[in-house]
């Protein structure tokens, strides 16, 4: 029987071991990623927190909101991590695909389109939902084609009115904003 030299066998064994452990290590790293974002109203009042947790299948979003008006509010991820007093610096909805706005439009929806948040009479809301296709940390890949962790970050926005899931302007003014700070920021 012909045998490869010992050093080649060791290198081959090390490469096999690395190949077998790399995917689980990457999954553990993605699972560990979490960001908590504080939201403020235009007048600087505390509007609660939103936690983003990276999972193996996308990002779990948990929002605990306060000091908002009763009723439905549009809730979106915006393209730029900036909240100026009028929140316009956050830009438009996060939309790397160039899709139409809204879950009810034939042209798809923005990656940053999220379900409405329903605020109770006491001004509070708690909701959680899942956002597939995104990651909190790079690198982008086929499984997670879009990252919220680009150089200028992203923002989470609560709008004054409910989203009709069709028209971009149906949610009204921007009521509260928080910055999803990039990892290097």
Task: Please report, for each region that a protein language model flagged, where it lies by residue.
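N-terminal leader/targeting pre-sequences
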Residues: 2, 26-185
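Bacterial N-terminal signal peptides that target proteins for export
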Residues: 2-14
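Bacterial N-terminal signal peptides
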Residues: 12-23
């Amino acid at each position: 029987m012909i045998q490869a030299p010992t050093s080649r066998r060791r290198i081959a064994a090390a490469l096999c071991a690395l190949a077998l452990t790399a995917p689980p290590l990457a999954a553990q790293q993605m699972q560990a990623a979490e960001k908590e974002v504080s939201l403020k109203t235009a007048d600087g009042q505390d509007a609660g927190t939103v936690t983003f947790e990276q999972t193996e299948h996308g990002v779990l979003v948990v929002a605990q909101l306060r000091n908002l008006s009763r009723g439905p509010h549009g809730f979106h991820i915006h393209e730029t991590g900036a909240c100026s007093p009028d929140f316009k610096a956050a830009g438009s909805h996060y939309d790397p695909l160039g899709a139409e706005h809204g879950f009810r439009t034939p042209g798809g929806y923005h990656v940053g389109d999220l379900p409405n948040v329903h605020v109770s009479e006491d001004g509070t809301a708690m909701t959680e939902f899942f956002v597939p296709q995104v990651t909190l940390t790079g690198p982008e890949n086929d499984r997670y084609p879009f990252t919220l962790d680009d150089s200028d970050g992203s923002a989470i926005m609560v709008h004054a009115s409910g989203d009709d899931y069709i028209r971009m302007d149906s949610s009204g003014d921007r009521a509260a904003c928080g910055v999803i700070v990039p990892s290097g920021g």
